[in-house]
Amino acid sequence: MPDIFQQEARGWLRCGAPPFAGAVAGLTTKHGGESKGPFASLNMGLHVGDDRTDVVNNRRRLAEWLAFPLERWVCCEQVHGADIQKVTKSDRGNGAQDFATAVPGVDGLYTDEAGVLLALCFADCVPIYFVAPSAGLVGLAHAGWRGTAGGIAGHMVWLWQTREHIAPSDIYVAIGPAIGPCCYTVDDRVVDSLRPTLPPESPLPWRETSPGQYALDLKEANRLQLLAAGVPNSHIYVSERCTSCEEALFFSHRRDRGTTGRMLAFIGRREEWT
């Protein structure tokens, strides 16, 4: 069965989960841009030491591919936490061309307005895409192990339930390409921080490979948290792609030993679709 994230003709993967058909949703690859050296070539991160002009040009190129102008993007700081902020058209442009203007202190964004593209950077962490088609809500979260330990996926569901009056049964989620357990070994500190966030009866999303070392399935940990938050299993779509394994396609912070570019995860609704 093909993965839910399939490559477009240009340098990005489209989220093909059916509930996301009314949104512009996907993830860039490492190809098709102007960046050089370890950032070659479609680096989307303004904060990694790459030439800013190259990164902005890369972002403008994606904006053209998507027909979603860069001036309508909203980016956030991404501090490896679990805080989330609702944004509107008044926030458009924040973080799009300058990291200093990114929405501060949060790792998730959501909006109920069309004409806003939520955009976050990734290079192994888990991109989590949310949509409630009946309400016109879209959201995006950055879940590294710290954000997962903080329950960021469930936090998005809780915010939509309590502030937007959306039942978890009306929410659909796509868990995008990220580092898999094949390539992600962690220690006791990490698994101990995740343990309290998981449903008590669920299988653990890790296996011990040697004393104090564990192969962690971060995508599965987030799936379990979404189930615990009330999202139906049939509403959760999970990519099998590993960002570390697919070296020809993705940047990987762990594989590339920290000096590398970033992919961009994005989701939004076009104004003409409302």
From Swiss-Prot:
UniProt xrefs under InterPro entries: Cu_polyphenol_OxRdtase, Cu_polyphenol_OxRdtase_sf, Cytotoxic_necrot_fac-like_cat
Q: How is the cofactor bound?
A: Binds 2 zinc ions. One zinc is catalytic and mediates binding to the substrate, while the second is probably structural.
E.C. number, please? Answer: 2.4.2.1, 3.5.4.4, 2.4.2.28
Domain of life of the organism in this record? Bacteria
Task: Give residues annotated as binding Zn(2+) 1.
Answer: 80, 125, 142
Q: Which GO terms describe its molecular function?
A: adenosine deaminase activity; copper ion binding; purine-nucleoside phosphorylase activity; S-methyl-5-thioadenosine phosphorylase activity
Positions annotated to bind Zn(2+) 2: 182-183, 242, 245
Report any Pfam family annotated for this entry. Cu-oxidase_4
Keywords attached to this entry: Hydrolase, Metal-binding, Transferase, Zinc
List the catalytic activities from the record. adenosine + phosphate = alpha-D-ribose 1-phosphate + adenine; S-methyl-5'-thioadenosine + phosphate = 5-(methylsulfanyl)-alpha-D-ribose 1-phosphate + adenine; inosine + phosphate = alpha-D-ribose 1-phosphate + hypoxanthine; adenosine + H2O + H(+) = inosine + NH4(+)
Which N-terminal stretch is annotated as signal sequence?
none
Q: Give cofactor(s), names only.
A: Zn(2+)
Sequence positions that bind inosine: 46-47, 262
Similarity field: Belongs to the purine nucleoside phosphorylase YfiH/LACC1 family.
Q: What does this protein do?
A: Purine nucleoside enzyme that catalyzes the phosphorolysis of adenosine and inosine nucleosides, yielding D-ribose 1-phosphate and the respective free bases, adenine and hypoxanthine. Also catalyzes the phosphorolysis of S-methyl-5'-thioadenosine into adenine and S-methyl-5-thio-alpha-D-ribose 1-phosphate. Also has adenosine deaminase activity.
What is the official name of this protein in its record? Purine nucleoside phosphorylase YlmD
Biological source species: Geobacillus stearothermophilus (strain DSM 13240 / CIP 106956 / 10)
